[in-house]
Curated annotation (Swiss-Prot):
Origin: domain of life: Bacteria
Main location: membrane
Protein name as catalogued: ATP synthase epsilon chain
Organism the protein comes from: Hyphomonas neptunium (strain ATCC 15444)
GO cellular component: plasma membrane; proton-transporting ATP synthase complex
Subunit structure: F-type ATPases have 2 components, CF(1) - the catalytic core - and CF(0) - the membrane proton channel. CF(1) has five subunits: alpha(3), beta(3), gamma(1), delta(1), epsilon(1). CF(0) has three main subunits: a, b and c.
Disulfide bonds: none
Record's subcellular location: Cell inner membrane
GO terms of molecular function: ATP binding; proton-transporting ATP synthase activity, rotational mechanism
Membrane-topology descriptor: Peripheral membrane protein
Role according to the record: Produces ATP from ADP in the presence of a proton gradient across the membrane.
Alphabetical UniProt keywords: ATP synthesis, Cell inner membrane, Cell membrane, CF(1), Hydrogen ion transport, Ion transport, Membrane, Transport
């Protein structure tokens, strides 16, 4: 399978994907990038966004990631995401509930509370995830 790229997507919670693919497109902090088999090695950071896994010209898997790192080596591409979800497993209703719960917690915190930044970051991630589901 020398004509395929080995791709792994890992979050702190679990490995979301590992397999041989044709092409991966990911949201780098310097811009979206694509990786094919035999790509030149590099490492970069990721921003929140959708990782698309292609077989031929068809997107077979979509994952929403919250930051992390992408490492391209001769062995393939590994993405270590701060948080990631398979978009085929996510539901808009569940995400809406999570957003509302986070917003309610945010209202309970004082303006100077350090937990506010964590909640605001989580709300931003969830809203991006919700937007990715709509597309």
């Amino acid at each position: 399978m020398a004509d395929k790229l080995h791709f792994s997507l890992v979050s702190p919670a679990r490995e979301l994907f590992s397999g041989q693919v044709d092409h991966v497109i990911a949201p780098g902090t310097e811009g979206e990038f694509g990786v094919l088999v035999n790509h030149a090695p590099f490492m970069t950071t990721l921003k929140n966004g959708v990782v698309r896994v292609l077989e031929g010209d068809v997107v077979r898997h979509r994952f929403y990631v919250r930051g992390g790192f992408a490492d391209v080596t001769p062995a393939g591409l590994t993405i270590l995401a701060e948080e990631a979800r398979n978009l085929s497993d996510a539901s808009a209703q569940e995400i809406d509930v999570e957003v509302e719960a986070a917003k309610l917690k945010l209202l309970e915190l004082d303006a100077g509370d350090t937990k506010r930044a964590v909640l605001e970051h989580q709300i931003s991630y969830l809203e991006g995830l919700r937007s990715a589901l709509a597309n």
